[in-house]
From Swiss-Prot:
Biased composition (Low complexity): 41-61
Keywords attached to this entry: Disulfide bond, Repeat, Seed storage protein, Signal, Storage protein
Family matches, as SUPFAM superfamilies: Bifunctional inhibitor/lipid-transfer protein/seed storage 2S albumin
UniProt cross-references to InterPro entries, sorted A to Z: Bifun_inhib/LTP/seed_sf, Bifunc_inhib/LTP/seed_store, Glia_glutenin
Subunit annotation: Disulfide-bridge linked aggregates.
The protein's name in its UniProt record: Glutenin, low molecular weight subunit PTDUCD1
Organism (species): Triticum aestivum
Length: 295
């Protein structure tokens, strides 16, 4: 028994020594939990700090790039290109003022021709007829043939009626009234010429038609086509007369001649005073319905 116990103790001692030898040879196997992985983790945290340091410089580099893009705002040359366009529009406005010379022509007519009430012109219609019939050969030497064909009795009647009505008009308005009478005579002559021109147009158009068709058209169209032609011819004439801007330069010169002759003839014939200037003040005869009143 003693021997057995001795051998058992020896075996225990041997196993313990063997275990100590093994642990001494492999020291990491004694306490694996005592390993310190913390220092490598601590080393990772300082490695994360350079990352924001690397990210910050690109942001700082992008900011100057934006700042460099912002000064690319030279829009001033565009505004300078728009500004020279405005002075170019001023010559267009100057051309518009130069283009319509008819407006200046109309203003001259309005200044020369007064507007008279129709009732006043009807009152002085005998004076108008007296001038149209050329009762006084000295007044219109170009129309002596027409004046010779008229009876002296009608001229005498027109003269008496004219001399009865002309003194009733205020002296301040006589010049304007006489000028309006001569203007109405020219417009009436222009209207008659316009009607004659329109009546000749259908005759020229019908020259190519056969004689049989012409005879039938004459029989059927004398009652139907002549009247509409006259009506159609009168409507544009009234528009022209109302506008009063269709007088040609030679007609204006003829108007001045007729007015000067009428201003010499009517005052001496009726023994009235007519001032040789247009009345600038407002008179009851200077308010009318338009140039159409002169007909």
């Amino acid at each position: 028994m003693k021997t057995f116990l001795v051998f058992a103790l020896l075996a225990v001692v041997a196993t313990s020594t063997i275990a100590q030898m093994e642990t001494s040879c492999i020291p990491g196997l004694e306490r694996p939990w005592q390993e310190q992985p913390l220092p490598p983790q601590h080393t990772l945290f300082p490695q994360q700090q350079p990352f924001p340091q690397q990210q910050q410089p690109p942001f700082s580099q992008q900011q100057p790039s934006f700042l460099q893009q912002q000064p690319i705002l030279p829009q001033l040359p565009f505004s300078q290109q728009q500004q020279p366009v405005l002075p170019q529009q001023s010559p267009f406005s100057q051309q518009q003022l130069v283009l319509p010379p008819q407006q200046q022509y109309q203003q001259v007519l309005q200044q020369q021709i007064p507007i008279v009430q129709p009732s006043v012109l009807q009152q002085l219609n005998p004076c108008k007829v007296f001038l149209q019939q050329q009762c006084n050969p000295v007044a219109m030497p170009q129309r002596l043939a027409r004046s010779q064909m008229l009876q002296q009795s009608s001229c005498h009647v027109m003269q008496q009626q004219c001399c009865q009505q002309l003194p009733q008009i205020p002296e301040q308005s006589r010049y304007d009234v006489i000028r309006a009478i001569t203007y109405s005579i020219i417009l009436q002559e222009q209207q008659q010429g316009f009607v004659q021109a329109q009546q000749q147009q259908p005759q020229q158009l019908g020259q190519g038609v056969s004689q049989s068709q012409q005879q039938s058209q004459q029989q059927l169209g004398q009652c139907s086509f002549q009247q509409p032609q006259q009506q159609l011819g009168q409507q544009p004439q009234q528009q022209q007369v109302l506008q009063g801007t269709f007088l040609q330069p030679h007609q204006i010169a003829h108007l001045e001649v007729m007015t000067s002759i009428a201003l010499r003839t009517l005052p001496t014939m009726c023994s009235v005073n007519v001032p040789l200037y247009s009345s600038t003040t407002s008179v009851p005869f200077s308010v009318g319905t338009g140039v159409g009143a002169y007909l």
